[in-house]
A protein has these predicted regions:
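A well-structured
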Residues: 2-148
Length: 148
């Protein structure tokens, strides 16, 4: 690996690590929402989750990050099993999936997940599926869009 390639690889890894830290914070907010969020806190948590999901998505679809990954992928053969080549292939595969999703969909999925979780808890406690049905249908609609 040339010095320039090593430098680019380190930049890509640094970018991916920071993105992973942001994703773990997002997951922590999700855990907290499912276990500790007080009633009435869902709207604010949905805003937090939506903002963070959008920021994470922006990092994944960042043009410079994509160009660096493409360059690194072009430098390594498909059968290269070095740690660096495997990392690049996995990051590129993850990025390729994410660039297909519009940011608005990513944000709406995040928001709907939070609101749906809270609606489900209330519906379960009140034995009233209708309280949850609208958000469940919206979630399914968004997941279908994501799958397309």
């Amino acid at each position: 690996m040339s010095k320039n390639t090593a430098r680019v690889f380190e930049e890509v890894c640094r970018h991916a690590r920071r993105t992973a830290v942001m994703a773990s914070i997002h997951e922590f907010l999700g855990w907290d929402e499912r276990t500790m969020l007080p009633p009435g806190g869902a709207e604010h948590r949905a805003e937090q989750s939506t903002l963070l999901a959008g920021m994470i998505h922006q990092r994944w679809v960042d043009d410079k990050f994509g160009e660096q990954l493409d360059g690194l992928a072009a430098d390594s053969a498909d059968n290269d099993v070095s740690d660096a080549a495997v990392i690049v292939r996995r990051l590129k595969r993850q990025r390729d999936k994410r660039v297909k999703l519009p940011q608005s969909l990513v944000e709406e999925l995040s928001r709907t997940a939070v609101m749906g979780q809270q609606a489900w808890q209330e519906a379960r406690n009140g034995d009233d599926f209708a309280m949850f049905q609208r958000l469940l249908e919206r979630t399914l609609e968004l997941k279908r869009q994501q799958a397309d």
